[in-house]
Amino acid sequence: HDALPIWILPASELSIRFNELTPIETILQRYPTGLDDVFPLVGSDLRQPQLCLQEPTSGRKMTIATTNQSMVLFSTTGFEAPFSINGQAMHSNYGLAIEPQEYPDIVHHPQWGSILLPANKKQTYQTVYQFNLL
């Protein structure tokens, strides 16, 4: 069967400590080809966010809590497009896609659970986006 390549690294082997606030510039310097990666999440308590983004100049803060098992972070590194966002041309690293989801290759790893939806069975995933000021 065809499957996505899976590498599971201990957090200690990553060049970023995701349990500490790290400027996005620092992350992109350490990952010059950008992010397009799946990060496993610990816990699924919607009262405890798994991701926090802060912008100190404006004082904006966004947290995300989800019942999903992972989160994909995709930076727009190398992405150039002929359209504008907020009056500025789209350019590399202008955005960050945040995608709470189950593991992309979960169908080949039954130990991670299942995304199969039997007929007439309800399945719910929740994601909470909270916006505040610092």
Question: Could you tell me what each predicted segment is?
Answer:
Residues 1-4:
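Short, small-residue-biased leader/transition segments that mark boundaries at the very start
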Residues 11-134:
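Active-site pocket scaffolds in enzymes
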